[in-house]
């Protein structure tokens, strides 16, 4: 077996499959583009779904890739086991309707065992297969595998809902008896027992059926085009090749671990307790790549995942004695390890470090708050004479403040207490069940459409005309190819078309189909790309249409031009965002409609009013400069040399279209654009908002819509000016300031009157002093308009020696408000209000000297007042 670095293993994989006619598909962003079913790219095949379900036919049906992926459904096991990771690389080879079982198995065996390639000892390899899949069993024997190394497994069948499915065959590497202390042997494989001896290194999925949840598996129909989908974990392959005990002792992780040793002064013990080193090494990889791809820490979705990873890694740093931000210092090491195939981490190093360090500092503050919360729990339990921290409280410390249960146990131990581990585990299980139920999962790939896949006629899009004559080369009605259609809805393909098919964020053209006499025979209501790349026109048929006849295709030119203005404005906006916010503000999605444009981009905070103004100003300046818009078709490498911006998630062919706007913007784009920015006329941002952690959205309008937006604002201002009796609109701010000053004065006078009224009322209330067990107290219902007045009562009470304790209750609206104030240490206002609040179906809390509660049961107010004496 060859000794190879991780970079060499990855490259050897790609090189081997290239010799078998595969195209190398670049690794794409971890943040899915145009796929709402996925939280993260979680496998090598996730980016190829469009090929497997037949939505798009690839240029080359043979594909290979090395794809970064994230899975976070098992975070708690990372660091505890030898092979669990949150971020990993999947090596894959794929056949989209081309080769199948025989070639996939033969080539897999060649790559693994050939001296030219990985050169694994054949006797170390074992394969599992689906019991009914005799063809795979026989093929493994034909390539030279000993039958005793072939293990039937009932679970070796891959399917997720409706869509492509089929048996799979897995390849395992036997690391020997040293990793099988109980000498269980092949039962470990046959019974799927978790073990460190037989390491799964590759799974080959033979996608040959269209799964249908409504019927038994035996009744699944064969796919019109069978596929191969494989996945080999790079980390596992490298561990086997480098003879590492775990994935962490490879060149993918050890440089990070060595840096952690330097920062902590601790030494990584391969056979000892090294969990913290593993957690940090794994999590900083995920953080570096995900942030580099535009995801940012937050409170939901991807952001919550990243925040949880960072906090977990940070806590493990503290276990190693690192008590200051340190994770950001590991980013360069991650970048250097992966630089040969993933240069983006080093390219975005400064930005990634900034985000990680900022989040570490924020967590330090949160941790401080959590410690206060924990101390409050301990103090509360001591007062009640209890010694067990409830599972729900342990879980809150874990979930809200990032406290590992072990840290809470340490706090409890110092206080002579214990924690309710079972209650904590139950709360954790509930959260995991909720997460599984609501998780965004990669659903089925969808059923293949055989009719559309079989249409291979040529169809060309003409950018340069709004009307042309073309032959009708395909008609689809009721999901079948037909020779003619006379009514209803149909899908048409022409040899040439002037209609733009929806893609790249630009909506489709609408228009009409006319016959030779000029009669309208169909209206075009949508245009989409067919699997083989043709423009598929959805039409409402008004008169008979026949195959191979010439028709005139006429788009709605006014509609197209409005869309073009918005699309070109989108490019200007993208460039302005880079200039004003920074290069990290890259496109995360766009929509160029008729009446507006929508642009999503990565940014870690709300865009300020000043920044929005500058962005809008810069876009308009470029419009008024009347910059020429040019398009050129070239190869992808030349385009990149020109400096054209390529977008994550977009699939580019060998030939690409480059759109330049003066010397201001240059992007790869297949859409339609105006010839000169002056055609846009005017640009106005109408809304900026967050749509997820680290992603912002701008809605904007151009041309007539922009003018109307300004007119609407002007009309509103004029109406306000009239209401304020301001002679001119520009005087509105001054008038508003005057009103605000009047309001402040009235509020001040009102507060003074309330204070006087409260003082007068307090004179009577404060006379009603009772005493029990040596404590003087006042408990009374008062009539006030808001809870703030209760505090005014309390402030007056504090100034004189009326009593030791004050309890005030007020019915405000349909609610009940309670205030408890104390002047002595042995009467804790916060604890007392917690005991009283349930009487009025409420709850509350606060400090030892003052606390408040709210409830809803007004008939129980007197009962609450009567209960005070019993609490003293």
Swiss-Prot record:
Protein name per its UniProtKB record: Alanine--tRNA ligase
Family: Belongs to the class-II aminoacyl-tRNA synthetase family.
Highest taxon, organism lineage: Bacteria
UniProt enzyme class: ligase
Comment, domains: Consists of three domains; the N-terminal catalytic domain, the editing domain and the C-terminal C-Ala domain. The editing domain removes incorrectly charged amino acids, while the C-Ala domain, along with tRNA(Ala), serves as a bridge to cooperatively bring together the editing and aminoacylation centers thus stimulating deacylation of misacylated tRNAs.
NCBIfam families named in the record: alaS
Gene Ontology biological-process annotations: alanyl-tRNA aminoacylation
GO MF terms, alphabetically ordered: alanine-tRNA ligase activity; aminoacyl-tRNA deacylase activity; ATP binding; catalytic activity, acting on a protein; transferase activity; tRNA binding; zinc ion binding
Gene3D superfamilies: 2.40.30.130, 3.10.310.40, 3.30.54.20, 6.10.250.550, Bira Bifunctional Protein, Domain 2, Threonyl-trna Synthetase, Chain A, domain 2
Binding of Zn(2+), residues: 567, 571, 669, 673
EC number from the UniProt entry: 6.1.1.7
Subcellular location: Cytoplasm
Reactions mediated catalytically: tRNA(Ala) + L-alanine + ATP = L-alanyl-tRNA(Ala) + AMP + diphosphate
Biological role: Catalyzes the attachment of alanine to tRNA(Ala) in a two-step reaction: alanine is first activated by ATP to form Ala-AMP and then transferred to the acceptor end of tRNA(Ala). Also edits incorrectly charged Ser-tRNA(Ala) and Gly-tRNA(Ala) via its editing domain.
Cofactor, how bound (note): Binds 1 zinc ion per subunit.
GO cellular component, as recorded: cytosol
Keywords linked to the UniProt accession: Aminoacyl-tRNA synthetase, ATP-binding, Cytoplasm, Ligase, Metal-binding, Nucleotide-binding, Protein biosynthesis, RNA-binding, tRNA-binding, Zinc
Gene name per UniProt: alaS
Signal sequence, renumbered to the chain: none
Cofactor: Zn(2+)
